[in-house]
């Protein structure tokens, strides 16, 4: 078990899959956002992904047609990118919305299970540390719960961090509903669509616990945020630094 006071020191509770994955995959990003409090604007690809999820949800809640879902997604995207400076990137990502929804709509609309909701908040504890997060689309039948996490991408590639996220959601939902939970990732590109089934989460949960212990051990020895940032060395070759706002924050925190 981990002492919650370690994470409370920097107001990190409840912890979340996104915080854990940030610590694992981009430690500087974890420090910038969750320790120093930088709030970076969403990129056009991120807004496009949220727009597609938002638009398609109207099929389940209001019985919208494909064209109506697409229009909802366009409206969401246009509103979210009003202040985007990179006009070429903005136009490029918007063009992906319709072909992606053309693939998603027939795939997800064929389920016969009861629709539980979208962006359902779920909670659990891992090694005594409270976790909270939000699922994508959740369904229920007599035997089990099924969660489908929609990932819209440029390439049909699965990410290990997505699987760790779903392992946590599986644990939380099984505790809440007292029945088996299937977690699936639906990866969609403008031309292809495919499922990734996560059948065995036992080793994923072990990996999550090890990462959480590692994070706690680092935070435990630091009394102030400057001490924590001094333990992380920025990798200037990381693609994450393509974002100008992150480079500016890096300059402030690390001086490079």
What is each model feature region?
Residues 127, 174-256:
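Metal-dependent nuclease catalytic regions and adjoining charged, substrate-binding loops involved
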Residues 7-12, 16, 27-39, 80, ...:
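Short amphipathic alpha-helical segments and their helix-coil junctions
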Residues 44, 48, 93, 97, ...:
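Hydrophobic (often cysteine-bearing) scaffold residues that line and stabilize catalytic clefts
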Residues 38, 153-156, 202:
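Short, surface-exposed beta-strand-loop junctions and turns on beta-sheet-rich folds
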Residues 20-65, 119:
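Nuclease catalytic cores
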Residues 55-120:
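A non-catalytic, helix-rich entry segment at domain boundaries
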Residues 117, 122-168, 176:
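Non-catalytic protein-protein interaction segments used by genome-maintenance enzymes to assemble
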């Amino acid at each position: 078990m981990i002492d919650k006071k370690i994470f409370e020191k920097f107001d990190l509770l409840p912890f979340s899959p996104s915080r854990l994955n940030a610590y694992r995959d981009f430690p500087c990003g974890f420090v910038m956002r969750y320790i120093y409090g930088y709030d970076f604007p969403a990129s056009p690809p991120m807004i496009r992904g949220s727009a597609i999820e938002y638009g398609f949800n109207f099929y389940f809640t209001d019985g919208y047609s494909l064209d109506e879902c697409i229009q909802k997604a366009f409206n969401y995207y246009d509103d979210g990118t009003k202040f985007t400076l990179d006009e070429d990137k903005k136009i490029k990502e918007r063009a992906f919305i319709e072909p992606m929804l053309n693939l998603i709509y027939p795939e997800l609309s064929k389920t016969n299970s009861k629709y539980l909701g979208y962006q359902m908040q779920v909670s659990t504890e891992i090694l005594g540390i409270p976790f909270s997060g939000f699922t994508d689309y959740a369904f229920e039948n007599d035997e089990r719960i099924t969660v489908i996490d929609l990932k819209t991408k440029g390439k049909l590639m699965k990410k290990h961090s997505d699987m760790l996220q779903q392992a946590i959601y599986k644990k939380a939902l099984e505790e809440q509903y007292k029945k088996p939970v299937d977690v699936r990732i639906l990866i969609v590109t403008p031309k292809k669509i495919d499922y990734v089934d996560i059948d065995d989460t036992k080793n994923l949960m072990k990996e999550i616990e090890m990462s959480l212990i590692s994070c706690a051990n680092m935070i435990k020895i630091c009394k102030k945020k400057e001490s924590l940032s001094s333990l992380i060395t920025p990798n200037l070759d990381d693609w994450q630094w393509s974002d100008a706002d992150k480079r500016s924050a890096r300059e402030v925190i690390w001086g490079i």
